[in-house]
């Protein structure tokens, strides 16, 4: 099958690799190179780099909502468009431009966690089950019919990297299965029950509320690493917690209290044991290294 691929981050790479092996990728659309590092050098997206290595034509328009881009896509000889974490809204004219429309890989149990941050919200909300869906896109926000779906049982303390990697590779496999059988698949409409929205994360959401349970805070730490990071302030400095573990111990402390010299912190329920931190503008450190340079005293109440 002849495919136009639209995607940007590392999450989309396994699918493009599979498409290159099993199908004919006619063009790739990805976000424009962005300035990175101290030298602010322009860096191509992972998808741009992969397409370049395979000599696939790459386009990086600033929008899909203009006649020039729409006409370009219509002229490309392709049967289908595959969209994964591209970063732009796809207008109706493009959704309907090819014989089989546009397919999307969405890493959640739709209609739960529709929107921009399904992986993060899955972890933050402590979900123990998820899914990867192959969806035929329509004009709504992740409201299209499901062509193929596979459920996942999640480890209790799965990290964002682990979940992303698992969903990326499963999604690639499911997409290839979908394309192989696309003429015979009966699309299934999404349920009108259980709809939730995985809104894009904000920096303010990263601030830790110590009155929440230790488990909820641990979920936030895992779901918000690397960005925006779950953080607290100490001596007017922002400190991100990159890794921790929780214990469902009963205690009598005010939430936010440092209960010993190992940086174990009382929460609304349970105790959080911090394992790795990063103070703003400094490198990440394990707890032993951190405490050698920053002395957070027992009985301190963190904000």
From Swiss-Prot:
Enzyme type, top EC level: transferase
Positions with a binding annotation for (6S)-5,6,7,8-tetrahydrofolate: 108-111
Keywords, in A-Z order: Protein biosynthesis, Transferase
Function noted in UniProt: Attaches a formyl group to the free amino group of methionyl-tRNA(fMet). The formyl group appears to play a dual role in the initiator identity of N-formylmethionyl-tRNA by promoting its recognition by IF2 and preventing the misappropriation of this tRNA by the elongation apparatus.
Protein name, as recorded: Methionyl-tRNA formyltransferase
Catalytic activity: L-methionyl-tRNA(fMet) + (6R)-10-formyltetrahydrofolate = N-formyl-L-methionyl-tRNA(fMet) + (6S)-5,6,7,8-tetrahydrofolate + H(+)
Gene Ontology cellular component list: cytosol
Lineage: Bacteria, Pseudomonadati, Pseudomonadota, Alphaproteobacteria, Rickettsiales
Assigned protein family: Belongs to the Fmt family.
Pfam families: Formyl_trans_C, Formyl_trans_N
Gene Ontology MF: a single term: methionyl-tRNA formyltransferase activity
Organism: Rickettsia prowazekii (strain Madrid E)
NCBIfam families on file: fmt (TIGR00460)
Record EC number: 2.1.2.9
């Amino acid at each position: 099958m002849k495919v136009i691929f639209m995607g940007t981050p590392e999450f989309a790479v396994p699918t493009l690799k599979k498409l290159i092996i099993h199908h004919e990728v006619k063009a790739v659309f990805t976000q424009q190179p962005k300035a990175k590092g101290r030298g602010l050098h322009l860096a191509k997206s992972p998808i741009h780099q992969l397409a370049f290595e395979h000599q696939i034509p790459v386009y990086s328009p600033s929008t899909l909502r203009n006649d020039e881009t729409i006409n370009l896509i219509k002229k490309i000889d392709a049967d289908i468009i595959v969209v994964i974490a591209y970063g732009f809204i796809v207008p109706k004219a493009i959704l309907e431009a090819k014989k089989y429309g546009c397919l999307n890989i969405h890493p959640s149990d739709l209609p739960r966690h529709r929107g921009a941050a399904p992986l993060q919200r899955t972890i933050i909300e402590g979900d123990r089950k998820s899914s990867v869906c192959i969806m035929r896109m329509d004009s709504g926000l992740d409201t299209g019919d499901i062509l193929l779906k596979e459920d996942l049982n999640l480890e209790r303390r799965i990290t964002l990297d682990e979940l992303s990697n698992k969903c990326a590779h499963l999604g690639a496999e499911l997409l290839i299965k979908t394309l192989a059988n696309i003429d015979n698949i009966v699309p299934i409409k999404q349920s009108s029950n259980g709809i939730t929205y995985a809104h894009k994360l904000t920096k303010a959401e990263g601030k830790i509320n110590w009155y929440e349970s230790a488990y909820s805070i641990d979920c936030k730490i895992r779901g918000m690493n690397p960005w925006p990071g779950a953080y607290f302030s100490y001596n007017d400095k922002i400190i991100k917690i990159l890794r921790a573990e929780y214990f469902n111990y009963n205690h009598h402390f005010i939430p936010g209290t440092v209960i010993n010299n190992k940086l174990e912190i009382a929460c609304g329920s349970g105790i959080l044991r911090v394992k790795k931190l990063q103070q703003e503008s400094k490198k990440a450190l394990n707890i032993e290294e951190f405490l050698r340079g920053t002395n957070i005293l027992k009985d301190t109440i963190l904000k």
